[in-house]
Amino acid sequence: MRILIAEDETIIRLDLREMLEKAGFDVCAEAKDGEEAVTLARTLEPDLALLDVKMPKLDGIEAARRILEERPIPIVMVTAYGEAELVSRAVEAGVFGYLVKPFRESDLLPAIATARARHEELAALREEADSLTEALGQWRSASWLEPGHTREWTLTWRGTKLL
C-alpha cells in the first residue's frame, strides 16, 4: 500500500515515515503543506493519505476535500487538534479517520486498517447502488416498451434498503 504523508513538522513526518515503513507500507511521498499534498495525490495516486490539519498554504481538511473530489481514497487526519468543530469539518470533507497527537504506532495502524475497510465498504455500496440503479432503469424501460411485462428480481438486503 502506497501512502502519502502531509505534515508541516519535519520530525513528525520522519516519525510517521518510520512507523509506516516498519509496518511494511510504502511511503510514496511527503508533503510540507496542503497544496503540495493535493498536487502529489494527483500525480502519484497514493492508496491512502495521512494529513495534518493545520498546515501552511492549505489546511489538511480542505486538502482532503480537494483530493477526494478528484480520486476517492481513504484519508486519515493526524493532528494535535481535537476540537469538535475540526472533527466535524473533517467528517464533512469525507475523511475516514482522525488521530490526535501524540499517538503511537499501536494507534496509527488500526486507524489505517479501519479507514481502508470503511473505504472498501463504501466503494462496494456505491458499486451495488450503481448496479441497482442501472437494473431499475432497464426494468422501467422494458416495462414501458412492453405493457404488462414484468421481470423477477432478486435483491440483496442492501439492495432493498437502497430502494
Where are these regions (language model features)?
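Two-component/phosphorelay signaling modules centered on CheY-like receiver
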Residues: 9-29, 33, 43
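Acidic catalytic/metal-coordinating carboxylates
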Residues: 33-36, 59-62
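Active-site beta3 strand of CheY-like receiver
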Residues: 44-50
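Active-site residues of response regulator receiver
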Residues: 52, 79
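Receiver (REC) domain active-site loop signature in two-component systems and cognate sites
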Residues: 55
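C-terminal output helix
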Residues: 85, 103-113
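C-terminal output/effector regions of signal-responsive regulators
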Residues: 123, 127-163
